[in-house]
Amino acid sequence: MRLQRKDLLGLKDLSAEEIELILETAAPMKEILGRDIKKVPTLRGKLVVTMFYEPSTRTRTSFELAAKYMGADTMSIATATSSVQKGESLRDTARTLAAMGTDAVIIRHSAAGSPALLARTIEASVLNGGDGMHEHPTQALLDMFTIKEKLGGFKGLKVAILGDILHSRVARSNIWGLTKMGAEVRVVGPATLIPPEIENLGVKVYYNAEEALKGVDVINVLRIQRERQKKGLFPSLREYARLYELTPERLKLARPGALVLHPGPMNRGIEIAPAVADGLQAAITEQVTNGVAVRMALLYLLIGGAN
């Protein structure tokens, strides 16, 4: 079984059936991660390249591990020391990679649409590791895999996304994916951090955390970037925490046993209280493991064999 597409650029373009296929394929991949010997030869002879124009630890490492566990060769392009610094365009870099026989490229770039440009330029599969404020599809898929694993599905679930919605590619991809799978999505944060057009994506908008969290099944907490405060988008980090930090008291407003997610890295004491981050309802460490499984599934479905 393979995805009937060359690339993974975003969840906006995926059907519910394709999302389900990815999540179903990730389950046996996670079983592989639980073995003493994690390597399988599925992608032996394939070359997977990571090309990150923005800093990343989790996503880049997760993709590289996923490729290695599947038997592929990997190469990481360090943009700070590559021809990119000499003015080489994205298209030229892509053509160079194609000439090397690359099978898949994972790209993270500050410019929205960069993965799509790359995908139009080369025959290799392109996977979006995050582009500007546009999408971060693999983060959303690992979030969804975690939800499905813990809660069994999506139909009728109430999911709150808490924090800086305006600048978050994680939020956008989660919204596209969750709404397609039948979940009710609520976004909550300061008015200055919620884009006015977000309701057009079929979400409910809240500016009060207590109202938004009532009766939800999942709370996905987004990282607050300190530079947003310097731009005057909220008065201070202390004020943000007072109104929007996920504390044990606010968590009690959700359904008993509600799941807590965070894409990382966390600002403890600002967007999430340490007691919540380390509590029994948090699946933050599991998200990291699930990220490797989901990325293994994607590489298999895009560049693996037909069987």
UniProtKB/Swiss-Prot annotation:
InterPro entries: Asp/Orn_carbamoyltranf_P-bd (IPR006132), Asp/Orn_carbamoylTrfase (IPR006130), Asp/Orn_carbamoylTrfase_sf (IPR036901), Asp_carbamoyltransf (IPR002082), Asp_carbamoyltransf_Asp/Orn-bd (IPR006131). Transmembrane segments: none annotated. GO terms for molecular function: amino acid binding; aspartate carbamoyltransferase activity. Gene3D superfamilies: Aspartate/ornithine carbamoyltransferase. GO terms for cellular component: cytosol. Keywords: Pyrimidine biosynthesis, Transferase. Pathway: Pyrimidine metabolism; UMP biosynthesis via de novo pathway; (S)-dihydroorotate from bicarbonate: step 2/3. The keyword Transferase applies. Its EC number is 2.1.3.2. It is an enzyme of class 2 (transferase). PROSITE patterns: CARBAMOYLTRANSFERASE. GO terms for biological process: 'de novo' pyrimidine nucleobase biosynthetic process; 'de novo' UMP biosynthetic process; amino acid metabolic process. L-aspartate binds at K86, R169, R223. It catalyses: carbamoyl phosphate + L-aspartate = N-carbamoyl-L-aspartate + phosphate + H(+). Carbamoyl phosphate binds at R58, T59, R108, H136, Q139, G264, P265. SUPFAM superfamilies: Aspartate/ornithine carbamoyltransferase. Catalyzes the condensation of carbamoyl phosphate and aspartate to form carbamoyl aspartate and inorganic phosphate, the committed step in the de novo pyrimidine nucleotide biosynthesis pathway. Heterododecamer (2C3:3R2) of six catalytic PyrB chains organized as two trimers (C3), and six regulatory PyrI chains organized as three dimers (R2). Belongs to the aspartate/ornithine carbamoyltransferase superfamily. ATCase family. This is Aspartate carbamoyltransferase catalytic subunit.
